[in-house]
Curated annotation (Swiss-Prot):
Residues 287-318 form a coiled coil. It comes from the Eukaryota. It holds the Pfam family Syntaxin-5_N. The keyword Transmembrane helix applies. Residues 355 are vesicular. This is Syntaxin-5. It is a single-pass type IV membrane protein. GO terms for molecular function: SNAP receptor activity; SNARE binding. Residues 1-333 are cytoplasmic. PANTHER family: SYNTAXIN (PTHR19957), SYNTAXIN-5 (PTHR19957:SF3).
Length: 355
């Protein structure tokens, strides 16, 4: 059998592949010897094994820890901001309540001005009694409602006083006292208007009684109405007496009608005066409630006044101490001499050693 001669790394003989197998690996020495003897042939791309897919790893533990810390700090910040948000919400509720009370006070003041204009009229023929009574009733109801609202506002401030700061509580108490003073001033004005109305009613009644006519009992009746007639004609006399009552003198009937009108007018005026008196009594009770509320605020105001006085004394003491220190510094001549000597020494050192 004739041996076959190898001419290279691969040879074909009768369709047989004699080159390297896909799994065969050459050693470095063999590869060098073979490369020195035989020119290397380009390796087919399809035969080169693809490198294995490797995933690059990176330690991101610190990033995870920093993200956890940032999230925890955000949650802590939200928790710390919750009291501030709660205080802001309480402040907004208090502001809305105070604004509503102030608006109601302004509306009631406008009604009171209108009532004042109507109550100061002294004419008998331009007396709008119905409108005055309606305004009086409305203003009285408004004052009662405002008194209740201010009491609720004070209770709200008292309930939330422990949760809010000292300055916020002081501000709230100041607003409550201001609203109470405005309500007291308006109630006092309303009371004075009612007193003016009462005086005008008394003057109108006196004027009306002065210019009214005499009552019917003082006027003589017609003799026909009181005359008797014969005893025999008793029935006819009674009939004529009945007819005489029906057929009165026109002047007497007008006087009776005028008396009825006067009675109704006097009764209406008496009712009006009773309403005014009851309103004044209710205003007195409102004044007592306001006085009690102001008395409760008196301790807070006194405490604020004492704190202001203490702060003023501290400021004055600090100012006096600063003046003393300034005088001691300005009068200390040795300090100026020492500073001058130090500057001279530094100048000499700089000129002699550094120049």
């Amino acid at each position: 059998m004739i041996p076959r001669k190898r001419y290279g790394s691969k040879n074909t003989d009768q369709g047989v592949y004699l080159g390297l197998s896909k799994t065969q690996v050459l050693s470095p020495a063999t590869a060098i010897n073979s490369s020195s003897d035989i020119a290397p042939l380009p390796t087919p791309v399809a035969l080169v094994p693809s490198p294995p897919d490797t995933m690059s790893c990176r330690d991101r533990t610190q990033e995870f820890l920093s993200a956890c810390k940032s999230l925890q700090s955000r949650q802590n910040g939200i928790q710390t901001n919750k009291p501030a948000l709660h205080a802001t919400r309480q402040c907004s509720e208090f502001t809305l309540m105070a604004r509503r009370i102030g608006k109601d006070l302004s509306n009631t003041f406008a009604k009171l001005e209108k009532l004042t204009i109507l109550a100061k009229r002294k004419s008998l023929f331009d007396d709008k009694a119905v409108e005055i009574e309606e305004l009086t009733y409305i203003i009285k109801q408004d004052i009662n409602s405002l008194n209740k609202q201010i009491a609720q506002l004070q209770d709200f401030v008292r309930a939330k006083g422990s949760q809010s700061g000292r300055h916020l509580q002081t501000h709230s108490n100041t607003i409550v006292v201001s609203l109470q003073s405005k309500l007291a001033s308006m109630s006092n004005d309303f009371k004075s208007v009612l007193e003016v109305r009462t005086e005008n009613l008394k003057q109108q009644r006196n004027r009306r009684e002065q210019f009214s006519r005499a009552p019917v009992s003082a006027l003589p009746l017609a003799p026909n109405n009181l005359g008797g007639g014969p005893i025999v004609l008793g029935g006819e006399s009674r009939a004529s007496r009945d007819v005489a009552i029906d057929m009165m003198d026109p002047r007497t009937s007008q006087q009776l009608q005028l008396i009825d009108e006067q009675d109704s007018y006097i009764q209406s005026r008496a009712d009006t005066m009773q309403n005014i008196e009851s309103t004044i009594v209710e205003l007195g009770s409102i004044f007592q409630q306001l006085a009690h509320m102001v008395k409760e605020q008196e301790e807070t105001i006194q405490r604020i006044d004492e704190n202001v006085l203490g702060a003023q004394l501290d400021v004055e003491a600090a100012h006096s101490e600063i003046l003393k220190y300034f005088q001691s510094v300005t009068s200390n001549r040795w300090l100026m001499v020492k500073i001058f000597l130090i500057l001279i020494v530094f100048f000499i050192i700089f000129v002699v050693f550094l120049a």
